[in-house]
Amino acid sequence: MEDEEGPEYGKPDFVLLDQVTMEDFMRNLQLRFEKGRIYTYIGEVLVSVNPYQELPLYGPEAIARYQGRELYERPPHLYAVANAAYKAMKHRSRDTCIVISGESGAGKTEASKHIMQYIAAVTNPSQRAEVERVKDVLLKSTCVLEAFGNARTNRNHNSSRFGKYMDINFDFKGDPIGGHIHSYLLEKSRVLKQHVGERNFHAFYQLLRGSEDKQLHELHLERNPAVYNFTHQGAGLNMTVHSALDSDEQSHQAVTEAMRVIGFSPEEVESVHRILAAILHLGNIEFVETEEGGLQKEGLAVAEEALVDHVAELTATPRDLVLRSLLARTVASGGRELIEKGHTAAEASYARDACAKAVYQRLFEWVVNRINSVMEPRGRDPRRDGKDTVIGVLDIYGFEVFPVNSFEQFCINYCNEKLQQLFIQLILKQEQEEYEREGITWQSVEYFNNATIVDLVERPHRGILAVLDEACSSAGTITDRIFLQTLDMHHRHHLHYTSRQLCPTDKTMEFGRDFRIKHYAGDVTYSVEGFIDKNRDFLFQDFKRLLYNSTDPTLRAMWPDGQQDITEVTKRPLTAGTLFKNSMVALVENLASKEPFYVRCIKPNEDKVAGKLDENHCRHQVAYLGLLENVRVRRAGFASRQPYSRFLLRYKMTCEYTWPNHLLGSDKAAVSALLEQHGLQGDVAFGHSKLFIRSPRTLVTLEQSRARLIPIIVLLLQKAWRGTLARWRCRRLRAIYTIMRWFRRHKVRAHLAELQRRFQAARQPPLYGRDLVWPLPPAVLQPFQDTCHALFCRWRARQLVKNIPPSDMPQIKAKVAAMGALQGLRQDWGCRRAWARDYLSSATDNPTASSLFAQRLKTLQDKDGFGAVLFSSHVRKVNRFHKIRNRALLLTDQHLYKLDPDRQYRVMRAVPLEAVTGLSVTSGGDQLVVLHARGQDDLVVCLHRSRPPLDNRVGELVGVLAAHCQGEGRTLEVRVSDCIPLSHRGVRRLISVEPRPEQPEPDFRCARGSFTLLWPSR
């Protein structure tokens, strides 16, 4: 921090002042303000002065400078406080809150915006879509709530007219997962009337000035706010503080877009605009006395009934009911009889105003609840997702003193008294009491305790709110003057209360109207006029029923209490003051349960002028905020305190005497040894149960040592844990394998027993178990089952063939080979007849030339030395020249011969059998065979001149050739096709079969590029 801010900028922390006096404090504050340094620390409390101008202190670059840094490492800034709260939440799993306080116009709302922007910028590094959605809603909600809850006042151009406390929920990684907004005491009386120089809520002016002409026409509105009673006071004013802020026209578009991003449907946005327009029209309704009857009860009428039409249309309610609700009210008598009582003009005006205030309040509450419904964390389970942590941001109205202060200012200032009391308890009172309790020597600091002022307001039975509630609940006529007299009677001796009756010489107060409270921030005179009425916050049930019965679902949802029966007797509702007191008590309890961070905002001048600091005005704020006392406590106190056990739990790994567990006499002794090893014992004090650390630098030193050791410890723990997991896994696997082994044994035994039972009769001929159904094996036994099935098939085949004579085995093997080669693609392949193989040597097939063939066969055997004849038959062949000849085919174990039967079976062609690579046949009953040989033309033949005629011998040729190839260990390629491709001298041709009934014997027909076998069909 000192590197970036030199002495010319003053002290960045008021604790560093040489002398703690008001003069030194103000001198340092003014110097820093003049140098553009609007932020200054008091320890961890940030003092912020509103500059009333844009300063280059914000944005992504500034966020990067403060992200992850300690408070003292950078100049004072809102980002530093936001970062400290975020780190405390993320690293220590502590719920934290940032309390932003100060009077109206001190810059609290802007401070809360910058805090939200910082949190949104530093979270969700992994860009999760759900987290981005939540961040967008958090940021956009501020824009929407400002439109409906902020207004221009004489002290602030963008004053929050409601209190806001926002909880932001974070997951264990520190990413926002949701949030919740609590609103407090909307100043709904502003809807009706504003002081000179002030405006109504921004939403009305944004609607009138930012809507398109078409939308204004549909809403029956004019663009000029001066036309409407509720907005004419501020019609000539704008919401802008200076030229950098958006105008009403631009803000309307920004708010509409923000509502869309948050999740408001187009219908809901339209309903909101209609409700705002209805309120404006309602404010223009005037009542006049007439002599007519009918709906205009007792001579009361609406001056301009077109306004009633507009209100009825915009609220989606019947016109007659709207008019009746304005002119009269329904009362249930004791006998549950309904009586309609007409209003006077004054009563009707009161009812109209009460309705307008209530509708706007319900609209604001609905907007807040709608935003909350979008922001609520979804699907969170602490057992699965871990504990959520929270950062709360409190932006609530500041202390207010107006020329005329009413019930709203009384509640606002009571709220500030409660927050000041919390600040005193947490920062001043509790701190000093803890030092005394722990036996820490220090210099006591005197401070003003405002508990007596809080007690004056909220004390049961005698407090101002209790007296006000009693006045509201009394059966008789109790006026505001009587209420004031009761206050005077109860508090005439109270040091912080006075009135004109108690102090007749004080002519600044009006007799019978004013009382004064000496607040911690100064004296405020309150006018009791309207106190009872505003506290009752009464609205006739007729309006509630009217709006509940609206056909607009958005408006209807705002009035659930309108559904109760008109004759139903209900409990008296809590008053506005009591509700506000209860909400303040709950808020303070909520804040007290969190680790607080404070931003104390100071308003530099009443003129809202940049660069001007009114010393007297600021001195007064410094005094009532207790900042000087805070400096004294901070200088005399300690930056941090922790129980010894918690301190050891976090830092014990930084000392050899305390890691992993110490053996010293007590935690206090262990902490002392740890600090002594680091050389930090001079900056701490030892209490009875806690360690008090004076400087934040000591904590940072310990945190840095811890951060260096954490990766090593994590690796050690990971190694140990992974080893444990591996051992657990190993033991489980061993147990699993043992169970699997025994289970498999059981399943194998059971399966084998079942197989044995089923196959007891498998040896019985002639089926040998062919009809037996195999049991379904377990998956693990499937390979075993497959092996058993293969063995069974081999055994059964053996049983079937063992009785076949050895002489028939070659024929059986050939048939098996043919069946495998043809794969069932040929209709008939002669498996049912006996295969003779050598048909040319048979006198039956070759009666005239069998002896001649035998001589030729002997000659070839002597010449080529083959061992056996595999197949022989007469064939009819066609060659590449389209010549058709009768030939003989001889297949031996070494050669394939083509013989000429007309020339004593002379050899026309001899092909080595090893060159034959395959053959092609058709799927029909014809005898066409195409033999394929390596490096030779394909041989196209048709088996011919068989006995009986047209006997099917193709399967026999395929079988003997395939069986021989299997015996040699090579594969014969057999193709079955009705259109067979063949090759002659490299020319591709096709051959097909054409059955002909009139064909006497097989023959070939040649065409260009193809052949056709003409086959006699039987």
From Swiss-Prot:
Cellular component GO terms held in the UniProt record: actin cytoskeleton; cytoplasm; extracellular exosome; filopodium; lamellipodium; leading edge membrane; membrane; microvillus
Keywords: Acetylation, Actin-binding, Adaptive immunity, ATP-binding, Calmodulin-binding, Cell membrane, Cell projection, Immunity, Lipid-binding, Membrane, Motor protein, Myosin, Nucleotide-binding
Region (Actin-binding): 584-606
Effect caused by changing residue 953 to A: No effect on membrane localization
Domain (Myosin motor) ranges: 9-707
Domain IQ: from-to ranges: 710-739
Mutation effect (residue 947 to A): No effect on membrane localization
Gene Ontology BP annotations: actin filament organization; actin filament-based movement; cell gliding; cell-substrate adhesion; endocytosis; establishment of localization in cell; exocytosis; Fc-gamma receptor signaling pathway involved in phagocytosis
Outcome (variant: residue 906 to A): No effect on membrane localization
InterPro entries assigned: Kinesin_motor_dom_sf, Myosin_head_motor_dom-like, Myosin_TH1, MYSc_Myo1, P-loop_NTPase
GO molecular function, one term: phosphatidylinositol-3,4,5-trisphosphate binding
Cellular location(s): Cell membrane; Cell projection, Phagocytic cup
Membrane topology, record value: Peripheral membrane protein
Membrane-traversing stretches: none
Highest taxon above the source species: Eukaryota
Modified residues (N-acetylmethionine): 1
Key word Nucleotide-binding present: yes
Residue span(s) of domain TH1: 824-1017
Binding residues for ATP: 102-109
Tissue specificity statement from the Swiss-Prot or TrEMBL entry: Specifically expressed in hematopoietic cells.
Complex and partners: Interacts with calmodulin; via its IQ motifs.
Domain text: The myosin tail domain mediates binding to phosphatidylinositol-3,4-bisphosphate (PtdIns(3,4)P2), phosphatidylinositol-4,5-bisphosphate (PtdIns(4,5)P2) and phosphatidylinositol-3,4,5-trisphosphate (PtdIns(3,4,5)P3) and binds to membranous compartments. It is required for recruitment to Fc-gamma receptor (Fc-gamma-R) phagocytic cups.
Function: Unconventional myosin required during immune response for detection of rare antigen-presenting cells by regulating T-cell migration. Unconventional myosins are actin-based motor molecules with ATPase activity and serve in intracellular movements. Acts as a regulator of T-cell migration by generating membrane tension, enforcing cell-intrinsic meandering search, thereby enhancing detection of rare antigens during lymph-node surveillance, enabling pathogen eradication. Also required in B-cells, where it regulates different membrane/cytoskeleton-dependent processes.
Similarity annotation: Belongs to the TRAFAC class myosin-kinesin ATPase superfamily. Myosin family.
Protein name: Unconventional myosin-Ig
Source organism (scientific name): Homo sapiens
